[in-house]
Each structure stands twice: as structure tokens, then as C-alpha cells.
Amino acid sequence: MSQDQPIVLDPTYASFDAAARPADLGATHFIGIGGAGMSVLAEMLHAEGVAVDGSDRAHSAKTDRLETLGITVEFGQRAENVAQAETVVYSSAIKPDNPEIVAAHAAGKRIVHRSDILALLMNGKRAVTVAGAHGKTTTSSMLSHILVNAGADPSYAIGGFIQGPDGTTLDGGHAGKGDILVAEADESDGSFAKYHPTIAIITNCEADHLDHYGDEAHYRAAFVAHAGRATGHVIISIDDPDGLAVLEALPADVKSHTVAYGTTARESLPDLGGAAYVWIASESETAGSGVEQLTLHLPAAVTAGEPVSQSVALKVPGVHNARNAAAAISAAVLLGVSPADAAKAAGTFLGAARRFQVRGTVKQVTVVDDYAHHPTEIAALLDAARRRYPDSTIRVIFQPHLFSRTKFFAHQFAKSLAKADDVIITGIFPAREKQADFPDISPSTIVDAAAGLKDASAGTWIQPVEDMCLAAKMMAMRAHHGDVIFTVGAGDITDMDQVLLTALEAHRESCE
């Protein structure tokens, strides 16, 4: 990057070729090293012997972990932090006027996006990427869990933690000694165009991130291109129309090594153009049992032998998790794990953190936290909640994520949230956006959309409450014995759980 040119940060620009290796980076500095995706990559480079340091705005569990590994973390972002670095890594959350970017540019240092580091780590490994609007973290976590249990010791880079036993969490990143790397492929900014995985999993292609892509056609085209870069197999859900459209758009040579999956019997599907098909059959949960039973019909193209009908008993609820399991198990089998061993390991998977994660119970009111932030994810979550808690009142505190997403999907959010009995919508988590750019968008945008629904919202109480603390107290006062309250969203609503549990204790008379 020339020092005489203006600073342009393009996450889609590929900085390395297939021959590059981590040692080529030299001393590497991460801006925002405590971020979920950045901390994992920093740890993996450190394990490869690269000299790594970084900066962040505040201490966190992630920065604490990095420091215990011997990685220096500076708090506050200043020009001097990049003085010793040869390579500076940024994420899409970092702007060109960041003082460390400005200093690195002025000094002529190599500035690369986090996706460049992930692409570099994939070189020389059997890489599995998981892309899609929904299910990335759960599918990549489940696949990593299966491979760990199979003794493969994979590396994995997952945008979150994994649920462990007794309410514990396991780190979402690991630098394994095996030759497999599992990673989420973030489609939000187009940076997944850099990846050339051995296996590309596409969990679904429902429109999202239209602020980047502009329209659904360009969004789907990005997935078609991503599938075309896979050097081995493509695994894609065709339960949603967009996924089927992507499959149909794939060139014949890509279809020939594609494995589609879904809940529709094969004979009821259109011609798949030579793609193999995994049928998810008999998915059900005995009400309140906590076990999702299904059978995966794995074709010879997956097993490299005879077709196999494999029973699976999942501890993660919902049909959406049956789909996630189909993708994870299919990939594991393609990587050499037996169908029986893959299914057994999947049955011990407790879920990714913040995915249907029980945070506590007060006076038999259960609080569950979930990352769902798209209308389809919320609908799947609430369907799973009805299966898991069939006799309970389902209450939701939802924090919308991004003003643009709230604007694009207000009516869809209203329809999905109508599956709950009570809903409070808090202030919107802005992430990379500014309220000033969306002056007419607020929690009331969704509430107003709900008021316009004819039947879907009948019986659902829905209110906007900007302040999360007030929202927690209000919901606690409404709760009764046996209710389940979900905190839902991709922002900082996850920090509300303790406030909510405390509020429930303070208003325990309403819970009895």
C-alpha cells in the first residue's frame, strides 16, 4: 500500500497467494485483538511460531486468555503500538482513521484484513469453511466437536464459545496438530471470496447483509462463487428456496462434487443436476424430552461405499439443528470419520455458546440466552422453544442488531416474534452503524409492523422499551411459575441475564 495514496481498507482484496505461509508475516499486530474472530486467529498464529501482539479498548476474557499465552496486549489504540510490527491485521469493525491504521500506512507496513490471516492458515491444510446466513457457529462447532472426539485434533476458528458441561464454556479457537482446519466463513463483507476450502458448507442462502450486497441476486451470486472455489466437496442446504437456487446456478462440474441436504424426501425434489442428497428423516422431539431424534440417509457419495441410514439423537433442539447436524456429520464422514462415530459424537454436543443456552432459573422461571438476530433464526428458536417447553409461557426480550437490518426486515421480525407470548424490544444495537443515518428506525419500527399483521400477532403482547435494565425489570414483573424468558440478539443483550435473574429474585412473588 503506497504511503502517498489515501487509506482504503478493502476486506475483499486478497493479500496472499496459495504458497504463502504464516512465517511470511513477520511480527504481527492485531487491532482489536480481543474480538471473537481476531483473538482466535492471534492464538493460532502464536501457535505457529509467529510473534504476535495486539491492542484493544478494554480487558476481557479473551484478552486475559491471550496474555496467559504470552501474547502482549496493549489497552487503548495508539500509533506507537504498531512500531515493531511488520504486518498489521484489522477487522471490518476498524475504520481507516484508526490511529494504528494511520501509523501503519505512514510507515509502509503490510496491512491485511483478518480474512487474509484465515486464508493463510488454510494453506496446506484440509480446510472446511461454514458459510450462510444462519447456523454457521453451531455447525462449525459441532463439526469441530465430532473431529476432536474422533482424535483428529483439528484446528478451528469459530466466532464464539462452545457450551461445555455444567454451564461451562470452551474456547472457540484451537491450534491443533492435525491437518484439518474448520472455520466460519463470514459472508457479511464479501471477504469469504479469498477462501479455497477443501469442503465448503453452505447452511443456507437467505438474504442478509443487503447493506453490503445491495440486493438478493448479488448475495446469492457470492455463494455460487464461493462454492466454485471449493477444491473438494460442496455441502449445501436446499430446504430454503435460496439454497436451491444457488445449487441450480452451480456449474455442472461443481454440482458433480456437491452434497445437498434437507428434510424433503428425495423423490419429492426436482432434478438436482447430479448432486448427491442427504435426507434428514424422522426429525422429532418428544415434548420436553430434550432429545431431537432423526435419521440421516447418507448416500454413497458421502460414505465412499454403500449408502447408510444413520440414527442420531441430538441434545440441541429444533429442526434447524437437525439440518446443522446433517451438514456437520456429512463433512466429518467425507473427512474419514465413520457415520456411527460421527453420530455418536454429535449426540454429546451441547451447543455453541449463546445458542439456546440456559443461564439460570429463579423460582422455576428459566432464563435462556440466544444469539438469533435474523427473523428466520428467531422463528426457528421459538419453534424449538415450543418443542422443548410445550407447557410454558414463552417470553422474549429482543435487542435488534443493526439499524439497516431492522429497516429491511421489520415485518419479518414482527411475524417471527409473534410466535412468543410476550415480547419486549429494546434499543437497537448499532454495531458498525450510526443512528443518525437511520433517524426513523427504532424498536417501535417492529412494534408498528406487528400492529399491522392481521393474524400472526394475535395474543402476543409486544412493547418497545429502549433501556435494557428497565426491560429486564418489566419482564420479571410479568413472569410466573413455569415461564421461560429468552434474551435474544447479537449485541450486548447477553449481559442482561444476570440483571434479569436478579430482577426475578426481587419480584419472586410474581413467580409463585
UniProtKB/Swiss-Prot annotation:
Instruction: Indicate what this protein is called per its UniProt record.
Output: UDP-N-acetylmuramate--L-alanine ligase
Q: What is its main location?
A: cytoplasm
Gene Ontology CC, one term: cytoplasm
What the entry lists under InterPro entries is as follows: Mur-like_cat_sf, Mur_ligase_C, Mur_ligase_C_dom_sf, Mur_ligase_cen, Mur_ligase_N, MurCDEF_pg_biosynth, UDP-N-AcMur_Ala_ligase_MurC
One GO MF term attached to the UniProt entry: UDP-N-acetylmuramate-L-alanine ligase activity
Pathway(s) served: Cell wall biogenesis; peptidoglycan biosynthesis
Q: Which family does it belong to?
A: Belongs to the MurCDEF family.
Q: Which terms are listed as keywords in the entry?
A: ATP-binding, Cell cycle, Cell division, Cell shape, Cell wall biogenesis/degradation, Cytoplasm, Ligase, Nucleotide-binding, Peptidoglycan synthesis
The record lists the organism as Bifidobacterium longum (strain NCC 2705)
Role played: Cell wall formation.
| PANTHER family given in the database record | UDP-N-ACETYLMURAMATE--L-ALANINE LIGASE, UDP-N-ACETYLMURAMATE--L-ALANINE LIGASE-RELATED
Identify the EC number(s): 6.3.2.8
Which residues are recorded as binding ATP?
132-138
Catalyses which reaction(s): UDP-N-acetyl-alpha-D-muramate + L-alanine + ATP = UDP-N-acetyl-alpha-D-muramoyl-L-alanine + ADP + phosphate + H(+)
Q: Where is the protein localized? A: Cytoplasm
* Signal peptide extent: none
One GO biological process term? cell division
